[in-house]
Each structure stands twice: as C-alpha cells, then as structure tokens.
Design a protein with these regions (language model features):
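A general structural motif
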Residues: 185, 218-223, 312-324, 343-345, ...
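His/Asp/Glu-rich metal-coordinating catalytic cores
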Residues: 1-55, 60, 64, 69-252, ...
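Generic long, charged, amphipathic alpha-helical segments
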Residues: 387-418
C-alpha cells in the first residue's frame, strides 16, 4: 500500500492524507488551510473522481473544509464519519460555503471600482449540500468493511463531539497491516465529552503534534478564572468578547458560565447577558443537546439525570440575523459576546473586535489555539494596531487567554496516547503540528525508542507488514508572503519580545486595585524573571 502526505505536515491546518491500498483510494480528512500557508501545498495526485471514499476524523473545518471542493471537482464516493461528526458537518460545511460566497461577493463589489476580474467562490452552498449527501454516519467501536481487504473502526478520541481516531486494517497478498490515524487527540477532563480512548496495537501510527513541545501545566480552575475576567471587565463597564470555535469550545464556555451563574461568582451585575452571536454555534448547540447521551461524560449525564441542561442558563441570548448581531454593540450594558471564528479570520467575531478592541474597558478573551499568521495570534503576541474591514484599529482592550483550555492534548497527553501501543509501532509519522514542533516531538519519540519521523507535504511512503520505504521526499519550499511593514516588524523574534513587554505593562495596569497579597506575588514573579534574564 502507499501513503501520500498532502496537508497539515509541518503545519497545523489543512489535514489530508491519501491511502492507496487493496485496489482502493481513500483520503483521511480533507481539510482547509486556516491562516496563511507555510509550505507549498501538494495537489491530490489522482483525480477526485478516482477516489473511493473519505474518512473524516472529526468535523472541524481544518479537517473537512475542502470536501465541497472535492465534490465540485468530481468526487462521488462516500464520506465515512461518526454520527455526531456527520451531523456537525451538515451545518459546518453549509456555513463554510456561505463564507466563501460572501467573501467572493464582497471582493467583487470592491473590485468593480478598479476593474478587477470577477472572483469565484471556492465552492458554493450547492457544492456543500452535495458533499453532505455523501456522508454516512456510524457508531463508535463498530467495524466497517469499506471494500474487500479494507476494514475501519472509529474510536472516541475526546477532542470534540464525535471526534475519532480511525483504525484501518488493510489485507493485501494474505497479510494484514494495521494503521491508526490519531485524529486530534483530546485534552483530559474536558466538560461534556469523554476522555480519549487508548489503543493497544498498530503497525503504523499517524499522530498529531499540535502541543508536542509544551505542557498545559496544572489544570486551572477555569470557572474561577473566567469569573475573575468577567468581574473586572464588567466593573470597568466593558464587554468581554470571546472569539470562539462555534463547535465544541462555545458549548464548553456555556457549561462554565452556567456554573458561574449558579454559584453567583460574578457580583454586582445582575443576570448579565451572554450572547451567542453565531448562527453556526447556535445550530451546533442544538446538535449537542440532541446527541445521544452515550457520547457524554459521567458529569454531564449526572446533570441530565437531574433535569439540568448543562449548557443553558438565564440571560443566554442568541442572535441569528445580521441586524441582531449589529444591535449587540449598541447596547451599553456590559455583556459577554461569544462569536466565531475562533482565530478571528472570518465571521462576526471580526465585527465585534472592530467595535471593542479600541475600548480600554473591554476585554478580548482567547479560549483556543491561534495558528501562525492569524489575527488572533497577532493580538496574543501584542500587536498595537490591526486592520479590520480596511480600517486601522488601535488595540486598547485587555487581551488575555484562558491558558490550558484546549481541546488538544499537551506533550504529556500525546506521550500517554502513543505509549499505549504494545509493542511499539513499526513507525510513527508525526503530522498536524507547527514546523519546529513536529521536529521536536519526533525527536522526543525517537529518544523514547520509537521509529519516528515528520514528513513534509508531498512525501510518499510504501508500507506493509514487512516495513516502510520512502518513495518520494516531501517539499520544503516555503511560501513567500507579501506583508505590510507593521506585520514584517512583528514577525521578528525580538519584536515579539518587545510586544510581550507591552502586554505585561497592560496586565500590570489591569491589576491596579488588586489585593496587596496578589500584587506582591505578581511583583516577585516579575523581579525573578528580570533577575534571570538581565544581562
């Protein structure tokens, strides 16, 4: 059999791998890039019409977002996924298509003034509908024969509702080889969903490495941390804008805010309003509520048994239409605004940033991973100004992050997952990580006795029961991006350090009036850091 690595290699987004085995061709994921590409992408080396099926690990757009384009270009096979993944993709792919059409329309309106050629959307709602019709949803832990010699099974990996690792058994010439694609490995103790399952055997493993170079550290009290952020922002008279992934993270936030309200952890602001300003997040929340309880963890099922909706509470409001969304920023009452997209690359979150970033009393709270070259990453790294809808916006709001709040396992979680295989796989391919992170994690596994490597886009391997051989090296050609003067300055490592210093000053200002004990501890930590690095 043959494996070709097509996307999310030395990058985090755009997952796609081609498996050619037993006379069949399957893609494992078919994801969209989010943020600017780092390395040149490789085209799928076969015509879409010659692909027999797609195996989707989970519903996030960086794993499924190019399925409508694949269908548009001639794919007619089945798309295999868990039942919740199929349900979530039915809304997420429609939403993605809407964004493609909207952005093309906006560019065409703008381009008419300069005589530019019309822009076509990458794909349309009709393409998304056609892709959705090809989905087939399955239960966890059920063996599915795709074709003679190819059997798969979805196993809960605890990243998102419906997320899975995929076990693949390929039988050729009387010999069976087992592959495991990890999908995105979940963090431990997330609300609502179960922890990752651990597998025992595989010949070859293809695993993500998003946080392969770092630890999330001790699990914070997210409810208490979030309550503090809400309290100090509301006390200043500001809004808390939370750019959030519509699926998964939004529902997790609702779970936390329900607990905050139940325990009255934010005082002096009554039944403060919380807006879900994302039609996609609203639909995803409905799917969460309708999902079979077997997909939920014990704590969530215990709440349901008591008649408590774990993601519903007084003051929760939804805005579906554009008019409802715009009205949010005309209301002076301090509020929480949860809006997609989580990396601020599209969607209504960009409008809320435009209206709130320049206000010192407001807070922008990041609650998820921010990929390189995204607006969210720039804000976290201390950008002073950002451009939104053609306007330069000064960053005056407090910028903060719920650290450790992640749907991805950290280094320890990844190591726990891969060390569950006994004996060790013949080879572990490291994918879905930033450039240097993949190299670091591959080296970590090598030091622990694994045969590990981090392929680049376009790399091709022949694998079987007797071993693996690299047939073609991947490309390491970096894409040169035209960047503005401000973006170029921010790209330097030293500038990142300067930006971090500016952010520290803002954090110090935000702590004015805090308890003396906390301020003294904060000062000691800063002085200790200065003593370490003062040269």
């Amino acid at each position: 059999m043959k494996l070709t690595f097509l996307g999310a290699n030395h990058e985090v987004t755009g997952s796609c791998t081609l498996l050619e085995a037993a006379g069949q061709r399957y893609l494992i994921d078919c994801g969209m890039e989010q943020g600017k590409d780092v390395y040149e992408n490789q085209p799928i080396p076969v015509a879409p019409g010659e692909i027999d099926g797609v195996l989707a690990t989970h519903a996030h757009i960086d794993h499924t977002g190019l399925l409508p384009l694949l269908v548009r270009n001639g794919f007619q096979g089945r798309i295999y996924a868990t039942k919740p993944t199929a349900e979530l993709c039915s809304i997420m792919l429609r939403d993605s298509a809407h964004i493609q059409e909207f952005e093309a329309e906006w560019k065409n309106r703008k381009g008419q003034r300069s005589g530019a050629e019309p822009v076509e959307p990458m794909y349309t709602i009709q393409d998304a509908e056609a892709a959705i019709a090809l989905f087939r949803g399955y239960d966890y832990n059920k063996e599915i024969e795709l074709a003679p010699g190819v059997i798969i099974r979805f196993v809960d990996v605890g990243h998102l509702l419906g997320s899975s690792s995929i076990e693949i058994w390929v039988t050729e010439n009387g010999a069976t080889t087992k592959l495991v694609f990890s999908g995105d490995i979940g963090n431990l103790d997330q609300p609502i969903i179960k922890d990752p399952s651990y597998l025992k055997d595989a010949d070859y493993v293809f695993m993500e490495s998003t946080y392969g170079d770092r630890s999330h550290g001790p699990r914070p009290d997210y409810v208490a941390e979030l309550a503090k952020i809400l309290q100090r922002t509301f006390d200043r008279g500001g809004n808390v804008v939370i750019p959030s992934f519509a699926v998964g993270r939004t529902q997790e936030l609702l779970y936390f805010i329900r607990e905050i309200k139940e325990k009255n952890l934010v005082t002096g602001h009554g039944c403060f309003p919380v807006y879900i300003d994302s039609p996609l997040a609203i639909e995803a929340t409905r799917i969460f509520k309708d999902t079979d309880s077997s997909c939920f963890d014990e704590e969530t099922n215990a709440l349901l048994a008591k008649g408590i909706d774990p993601i519903q509470f007084p003051g929760l409001k939804v805005s579906v239409t554009s008019d409802e969304s715009r009205a949010i920023n005309t209301d002076p009452v301090p509020k929480v605004i949860i809006s997609a997209s989580g990396m601020c690359e599209a969607g209504r979150s960009r409008h809320h940033l435009k209206h709130n970033l320049w206000r010192k009393e407001c807070t922008v709270l990041f609650v998820g991973y921010q990929a390189v070259n995204t607006l969210g990453r720039s804000l976290l790294e201390g950008a002073d100004n950002v451009k939104l809808f053609g306007e330069s916006i000064e960053v005056q709001a407090e910028i903060c992050q719920l650290t450790g709040l992640s749907g991805h396992a950290d280094r320890e979680g990844l190591l726990k997952w891969v060390n569950s295989f006994e004996p060790k796989p013949k080879r572990v391919f490291i994918i879905h990580g930033e450039d240097e992170v993949e190299n670091i994690f591959a080296q970590t596994l090598t030091e622990q006795g694994f045969n590990a490597s981090a392929p680049y886009n376009g790399e091709q391997w022949a694998i079987g029961s007797e071993g693996a051989v690299c047939l073609k090296e991947g490309t390491r050609i970096r894409i040169e991006h035209h960047v503005s003067e401000g973006a170029a300055r921010a790209a330097t490592v030293f500038q990142r350090l300067l930006n971090a210093g500016k952010r520290l000053l803002r954090v110090i200002e935000h702590n004015e009036g805090g308890a003396n004990k906390d301020l003294a501890k904060f000062a000691d930590q800063i002085n200790a850091l200065c003593d370490k690095w003062d040269r």
